[in-house]
Amino acid sequence: MAQKTRATAARKPRRKVNKNVTQGQAHIKSTFNNTIVSITDPSGAVLSWASAGGMGFKGSRKSTPFAAQQAAEAAAKGAQEHGMRKVDVFVKGPGSGRETAIRALQATGLEVGSIQDVTPSAHNGCRPPKRRRV
């Protein structure tokens, strides 16, 4: 059987457009298993993001406050390359890395304007997971 050759077009690597955005939003999603930090411009376009799993933490170490701190620092450094100076923080979820991620954003030099908790709460919606027996 003859080998088929596929012609693949050479892809040009997409260049990162350096936006100059001084004010934006930091969205921190902190679940029981992971913490994701996304920093956006005021319209909601993501400039930089990082997660605890992406920082090299695996398993139960992803849910630690230290992993959330590392993720927030990495996302803040990426946003500062775009000229970010001030952020409004939106926190979602019940995880352990909420406060630590906010402190890490402040420690990297971003000025925190406001902090809002946007955790969705069910009005008797889905049945919660069964209780753990250890």
Curated annotation (Swiss-Prot):
Q: Which GO terms describe its biological process?
A: translation
Q: Where is the composition biased (Basic residues)?
A: 9-18
What keywords sit in the KW lines? Ribonucleoprotein, Ribosomal protein, RNA-binding, rRNA-binding
**Region: Disordered, residue numbers:** 1-22
What is a GO molecular function of this protein? rRNA binding
* PROSITE patterns for this protein: RIBOSOMAL_S11
Which InterPro entries does the record cross-reference, listed alphabetically? Ribosomal_uS11 (IPR001971), Ribosomal_uS11_bac-type (IPR019981), Ribosomal_uS11_CS (IPR018102), Ribosomal_uS11_sf (IPR036967)
Its GO CC terms are: ribonucleoprotein complex; ribosome
Q: How does it assemble?
A: Part of the 30S ribosomal subunit. Interacts with proteins S7 and S18. Binds to IF-3.
Regarding protein family, the annotation reads: Belongs to the universal ribosomal protein uS11 family.
Give the protein's biological function: Located on the platform of the 30S subunit, it bridges several disparate RNA helices of the 16S rRNA. Forms part of the Shine-Dalgarno cleft in the 70S ribosome.
Q: What is this protein called?
A: Small ribosomal subunit protein uS11
Q: Origin organism of this chain? A: Kocuria rhizophila (strain ATCC 9341 / DSM 348 / NBRC 103217 / DC2201)
- Record gene name: rpsK
